[in-house]
Every structure is written in C-alpha cells, then in structure tokens.
Regions:
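Acidic, metal/ion-coordinating pockets
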Residues: 2-12, 25-78, 87-409
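Acidic, low-complexity cytosolic linker/stalk segments
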Residues: 16-17
Length: 409
C-alpha cells in the first residue's frame, strides 16, 4: 500500500470514528431524556399520591368532626350539679360526689314451732273415739287445724313434729303404741299451713322401715319438707336459708353429740343463715328437762344453732336463754291422735322472728308464746288444737314462766 492509500484509509477511519461518536452522543442524549422523563413522572405520581392521601385525611377529619358534633347534640343535658370539663374555675370549685353502693334491705321471717302431731291412731285403741273416726265423721282435712290455721298461714314457716307414720303397711312393730295414718292425711298439714315436719322420733318406724320411707315420700309429694336423723333440710324462706335438723336422743343420750356437731356443720356448708335444731328427748310427763337435754341443747347453740326446740315429754317445759339463744325444752302435744283424752291438754305455739341483713343474722330476740289447748273440747280430745284466751291463757303463760325461771337462775 502506497502512502496515498494509507492517507485515504486513515481519513476513512477518522470519519468513521466521528460518525460513531455522533451516534453515541445521540444515544446518550436519548437515554438522558428517557431518564429525566421517568424521574419527572415519578415526581408527578408522588405528588398526586400525596394529594390524594391529604384529601382522604381531610375527609376523615371532617367525618369524625361531624360524628362528634352529632354525639354532642344527642348527649343528654347534664343537670346543673354536673362539672363542666372546659370550665377549670367551676371544676375546681365543685366537689366530686360518688353514689353509695346500694345495700340489701333487712328481711324478717317468723317461724312457728309446735310439738307432737300424731295424724292417725293405734289399731288397739277404741276406734269410735279415735283420730280416724273424727276424720271420717268430719270428712274435712281442714277441720283439725281450723282454729290455728290463721296463725300458721300468717307466719312464714310452720314446723311440727310428725309423731307417727303415714303408710298402708300392716307390718306393726312389737311395741306398746304404734301409730299410723292414711297417706291422704298429708292434706291435714297442707290445709292447716304446716310446711315442714321433723321425723326423728320414737314412732317414725312404727310399721317398719318401709313406713318411714312411705311417710317421707307422701309428705314430700304434698310439698311438705321433711328432716330428721341424718337427713337435714335447708329451706328458702323469703330469700333466707333456714337449716332444719332433727335429733332423736332417747336411745343414745349423749352419744348423739357428734351427730349434733356434724348436722349443724352440714347445713352451714349449705349456706344456712338461720339454724333450728329439733330434739326428741326427755322424760314423759316431766316438766323439768334433764341434764342430757341441757347438755345437748347447749352444745347445739355452741355449734351455731339459733333456736333449739324439743318434744316427747307430752307436757310443757320451760324456755332457757343460753348465749342469747332460746331453748324451748318441750312444746308438749299439739294435734295428738295418740291419746283420746290426755289429762294435761296444755300446749303452745312458739314463734320467733329472725332478721337477716346482707346475708347475716342481725336480730333474733323477737318471740311470741301463744298458749293453746290440744283440744277445743275440755272433756275429751277432739284433735282440734285451739288458742286459749282470758284466764286460761294467763294460767298457761304463768306455768311456762315458772318453768323458765328455774332454768335461767
């Protein structure tokens, strides 16, 4: 290649390089423009997004303000004694007041206690003058408690000692006296206003164990609460839980102490607020309680009983005040089919009022002794207890007062 050819070849190379450099510049400019365009687009998009978000926040703020305004307009007007939160002077000058917690009103119940009720007879008695004969003759279950019904329906709870059985069993036990009545005799109690019966006594099994079970079944079916032995009961009386316990002492004496302790604890565990213990104890025809009666009664009070009553002597005994609680040692007979003409017809209805406030017994010293006769006929037993009046009432009250004075010396 000569020099001229070399020069031409060099010029072509320089020309190509200039041509390529120009193209590169164009490409670079295009890339730059595209980059700028993208960047500007991003800026515009970000600005639009920010504006949209600001608009949304503004709308939400307006909506919230509108809701608050509506709530303020619908809020009940405060009374003049309320504190204005925006008025610091008023707020500082007014004392904050609090509403006291409501307390439960005291609730009082009156309980009536009566003694031995034998609704039936012994098959060996003269049936012409028996309890059953009067039932058939009167043909009215309401006859027997007719003269005391107003008292029993006016109280809150009436409790009796059910001295006998209600059964159709003929399995009479070998004993001097065995009492049974027809199961329909439950109507005597329901129509008379009796709500609960103690069954822990020496006549509850007169026709065998089945007669005892029958008596429970028929009484409970009639709506009458039963208790006694190891069967305690807790009744709801006007919202007050009343625990009922029946103890049969005649055979075991002081051997019943543990049962007293256990049964009282049992009704406590069931929430009893008032506890009544009914003892079948003592000596027949005796107006003076023995040492076993006193020991068991005091134990019951010490363990938490609020009232102790007794029966079995068939006559009245005194009332002792022990640790502020009442012990009625014997209520005597009441509606008693076990004797066609008892020589001592004196009896009573013992009433006590218990007041409970905020679940606690706060008062139990209101008592009422209503002297009665177990018969409304003086010459024989017509099995219809009645309230005594006048001199007879005063005589029985005086008797109870004398018996009680000896116990409270």
């Amino acid at each position: 290649m000569n020099k001229e050819q070399q020069r031409r070849h060099a010029r072509r190379r320089r020309k190509r390089r200039r041509r390529m450099s120009y193209r590169q510049k164009i490409v670079y400019m295009q890339i730059t423009l595209i980059t700028v365009a993208i960047f500007l687009g991003l800026l515009v998009g970000a600005a639009a997004l920010t504006k949209a978000m600001n608009n949304r926040q503004a709308q939400n703020s307006e909506k919230t303000a509108s809701q608050e305004q509506q709530e303020e307009t619908t809020e009940p007007k405060k009374d003049d004694s309320s504190t204005d939160n925006t008025d610091d002077t008023s707020k500082d000058s007014q004392e904050e007041t609090t509403t006291p917690e409501p307390t439960a009103e005291p609730v009082s119940i009156t309980v009536s206690m009566v003694g031995d009720c034998t609704l039936g007879t012994d098959v060996n008695f003269d049936q012409s003058t028996s309890f059953d004969a009067f039932y058939q003759m009167k043909n009215d279950p309401g006859y027997f408690f007719q003269k005391v019904k107003d008292i029993f329906t006016a109280d809150d709870l009436t409790v009796a000692n059910m001295e006998g059985t209600l059964t159709t069993s003929n399995d009479r036990q070998q004993k001097t006296f065995a009492f049974k009545g027809d199961p329909s005799y439950t109507e005597i109690l329901t129509q008379g206003g009796v709500e609960a019966t103690n069954l822990a006594n020496n006549h509850s099994h007169d026709y065998g164990d089945q007669s005892y079970e029958d008596t429970i079944q028929y009484l409970e079916a009639a709506g009458i609460t039963t208790f006694g032995y190891d069967r305690t009961a807790v009744m709801d009386v006007k919202g007050i839980k009343v625990g009922l316990i029946g103890i049969y002492e005649l055979k075991d004496g002081l051997g019943r102490q543990q049962q007293v302790i256990d049964t009282i604890q049992e009704v406590k565990d069931q929430g009893a607020q008032v506890i009544i213990v009914s003892f079948h104890w003592g000596t027949e025809k005796s107006n003076i309680p023995d040492d076993i009666q006193k020991t068991l009664a005091h134990l019951a009070i010490d363990q938490g009983a609020d009232l102790v009553v007794g029966h079995h002597p068939h006559v009245l005994q005194g009332i002792e005040k022990y640790q502020g609680k009442n012990i009625v040692y014997s209520l005597g007979n009441f509606c008693f089919g076990g004797n066609k003409n008892p020589s001592d017809k004196d009896t009573m209805i013992f009433q006590q009022t218990f007041t409970v406030e905020n679940g606690e017994l706060v008062e139990d010293d209101v008592t009422n002794i209503i002297p009665c006769s177990l018969s409304s006929e003086s010459g024989y037993n017509n099995y219809q207890p009645m309230v005594l009046e006048g001199s007879e009432k005063e005589r029985v009250l005086q008797k109870i007062e004398e018996f009680s004075a000896a116990l409270n010396q």
